[in-house]
Amino acid sequence: MKTKIINWGMIGAGDVTEVKSGPAFQKVEGSRMLAVMRRDEEKVKDYALRHSIPKWFTDAQKLIEDPEINAIYIATPPDTHDIYAIAALAAGKDVYVEKPMVLSVERAQELAAAVHNNKGKLSVAHYRREQPYFKKIKTLLEENTIGKPQMVLLQFANKPLTEMAMRDPKIKWRLDPGQSGGGLFHDLAPHQIDLMYYFFGTIRDVCGISHNQAGLYKADDVVAGQILFQNDLLFNGTWTFNAFEEVDSCQIIGTEGKLSFSVFSGQPIELVNKNGSQSFSFEALKHVQQPMIEAVVAYFKGERSNPCSVEEGLEVMKVLDALTGK
């Protein structure tokens, strides 16, 4: 029996795809990047040449309809995620869509309906849950190394963007709620919120507040919120993008110990309990999405369960909307 090959077509060829994700599609067994689409003809030709991709398109629908392609990777800004995903599903293609999955809960529900009404599969690129670093944290929790988790304290802070940075096309769209959903918070927080859902499961209640403090751009730049999980764990999170120093800190406090780690900076995981202190370090991944892409390819081939479903993406969108008052 011939093994199924996942032939990818990629819609969008921006900065995130250059190293984080794009090359990994060619390195995963049973996977190859067959085509790429970008509206700028010269840029898409250059991208295809540099990454040894045999086909290129300037029209997304033509890429979707290519009979050789059986899976679509959507790496555009979030305002078009659901548009391309629904079109791909209607064409019978499997879909791997970048985070945030869409712009709102309503659009997430429409995408979920499209998944259920078509044969194609869909996975969301909440890729940190497949990285060894975060799988280790999940294992430590499952092994009850800190007893029953009681509270999560997450703090995230970035320095304000410079005027030059705000004019950079790679950043500018992230600051427009119409394209990104809600600024830098919507760009980064999906990773953090998804990990909490991955670690702790069903969410019972969410409350939050967001505000535009600095007025540097349209989107809010400070967010604070709480999440109550079904297991009675309480999450407290704060995000600011106008700080004098950068902070990337998360603590999970249990009845018998504490786990401390970072979501983005790769600091060693620190475990403190009655047995003393332990530290766990991991090498940085060259292609940060490769473990997730391996899992998605296996799912599309029918070899495992979905590593991150549309329903899980919907739960993250519900939290993002609740924290920002949408």
Question: Regions from the language model: what does each represent?
Answer:
Residues M1-H51:
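N-terminal Rossmann-like dinucleotide-binding module
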Residues M1-I5, S31, A71-Y73, Q109, ...:
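C-terminal helix-rich "cap/oligomerization" subdomain common to oxidoreductases
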Residues D46-I53, L111-V115:
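Short, conserved SAM-binding/catalytic segment
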Residues I53-A60:
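Conserved SAM-binding strand-loop segment of SAM-dependent methyltransferases
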Residues A71-P78, D82-R129, N144:
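Beta-strand-loop-alpha-helix segment that lines the small-molecule cofactor/substrate pocket
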Residues Y127, S249-D321:
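C-terminal glycine/acidic-rich active-site capping loop/insertion
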Residues R128-I209, Q213-G215:
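Predominantly a Rossmann-like dinucleotide-binding segment in NAD(P)-dependent oxidoreductases
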Residues D187, I193-G266, I293-R304:
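Contiguous beta-strand/loop segments that form the cofactor/metal-binding neighborhood of enzyme cores
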